[in-house]
């Protein structure tokens, strides 16, 4: 599998999935943090997108769980709200980057090209 997308918003999941599939990448989708963690532990991914604010297990908690197992996989947090303090905390936790909502297809493709070629 190439990409894991974890987001509680159906529209965001669908948009990212379509972008990946149009570019011939295999995608798994999780609609919450628990599903995302389960998929992460069952499969190997080359790139992960995680929504920061989700009910139940937050994106930050999912990120922390991923980093326990894999320190190197590129992980991008999807967020509509990002203070400079929050960004610094995420970077200290070894986050690869932040994809700010609303995002463009080109912003997503720049990330994909960087990590998946």
Question: Would you name each region that the model predicts?
Answer:
Residues 54:
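Receiver (REC) domain active-site loop signature in two-component systems and cognate sites
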Residues 61, 82-97, 106, 110:
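Alpha4 helix (beta4-alpha4-beta5 surface) of REC/receiver domains from two-component response regulators
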């Amino acid at each position: 599998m190439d990409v894991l997308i974890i987001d509680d918003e159906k529209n965001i999941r669908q948009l990212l999935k379509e972008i990946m599939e149009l570019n011939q990448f295999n995608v798994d989708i999780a609609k919450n943090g628990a599903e995302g963690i389960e998929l992460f532990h069952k499969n190997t991914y080359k790139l992960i997108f995680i929504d920061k604010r989700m009910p139940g297990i937050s994106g930050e908690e999912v990120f922390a769980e991923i980093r326990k197992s894999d320190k190197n996989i590129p992980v991008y947090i999807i967020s509509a709200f990002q203070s400079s303090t929050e960004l610094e905390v995420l970077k200290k936790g070894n986050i690869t980057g932040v994809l700010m909502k609303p995002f463009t297809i080109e912003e997503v493709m720049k990330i994909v090209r960087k990590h998946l070629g």
